[in-house]
């Protein structure tokens, strides 16, 4: 980490986690177990309601790989219940701009994640299918794939369109 004003440089240690690779359609999606732990913890904290948010990552077209780097916090204007989650917008633009600034625009928005309640798998519901279609329509305008990640009690489902 460097200080632009003083020119000082300091070290910042981060914990490394094993990487998980999943084939989703024509894409390979990679994320580390630290992100998986974060998603599972966030889900548990929100129960009995669903939760979710935006996913940031790196899209590598040459290797058809999407690296999931992190998720943005759930906006305070989000709506959730045990049966649904609708992500709000408050603070999202600023949070994404901060990610882009810190990573020289290497890391960007790649999609959405949400949880399913107790007793349900991570299989996409009809509403989830409609959401990934809408997300794909928006992102394909810029030539980008859309990622949807669903976290349930015992499984994680990643869809790329």
Give residue ranges: language-model regions.
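Conserved beta-strand-loop surface patch within small alpha/beta domains used
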Residues: 1-109, 117-161
